[in-house]
């Protein structure tokens, strides 16, 4: 395709003196080695120009090599058995203790991205083991042949255009991820540029593309976020559909409740249009009036009881008016009974006076009278 070329690094041979060198390789992050001479043909001239530009390794590669070579840090980072790869054994401690000393940051993800820009690749997925054909134990001179890849401006423009097209085509508006263009300095620059962890995914992925063979073979890598945007739009569309169903269900429930309450309060339905907008309906006015009447009656009853208690006499704080009235009634009833008995006794006395006395009673009465007379003498 135009703007994208893949393939292995061509081997360049030239006539004259020269040495072995390495150049950054294909799209998978591998690198290949080729021979270049200082004179001779056109290929030799190109190789000589590359050696002049790659005479000094970048500080990032130098510091990384020193970390791997130092036996003091073997518990955190070290070579493998044959010295072709290096392994970060404890990423957390490595980022906390060593990265601030050498790279002025403590972000392990940034360190890994920086390795990717120099063509390092991860060997196994379950371990932080990285390899590069020009990064080997005892061959520090090969570091100058590791090229740092550049970010192509057309690739960034294509990524931005694809993201904009995906957003425009989607039905749901999604905030697009900003695309930040990082201008990477050439490999012989002394300033290290570490990609920040806040960089966009498009910019971080675009950093994989680069220049191969000192500019002779250029590869453009474009990484769009269109699939991610489509997936996000699909998820948001499903969420909107779910919320719409819930809203419809709640509206139906509200309508049923309103109808049920309207059946119990028929007057409210006629007066609904008279209520100001936003004012809630008073669905239970009768209950409120009833409660107010009950409260008023309780207050009046309490006042009456209080007044009655104030009018009755008390003994040691206890009302005795009711008991006194009961005693008066009992006394009145007893007096009436006594009166009845007296009347009955008087009637019996009158009846006994009319009865004729017996002779013995007369004699006895005479004797008694005589005795009384004798005593009187």
Curated annotation (Swiss-Prot):
It comes from the Eukaryota. Pfam families: HSF_DNA-bind (PF00447). One of its GO terms (cellular component) is nucleus. It is found in: Nucleus. Residues 1-56, 326-377 are annotated as: Disordered. Keywords: DNA-binding, Nucleus, Phosphoprotein, Stress response, Transcription, Transcription regulation. Homotrimer. Belongs to the HSF family. Class B subfamily. This is Heat stress transcription factor B-2b. It comes from Arabidopsis thaliana. The lineage of its organism: Eukaryota, Viridiplantae, Streptophyta, Embryophyta, Tracheophyta.
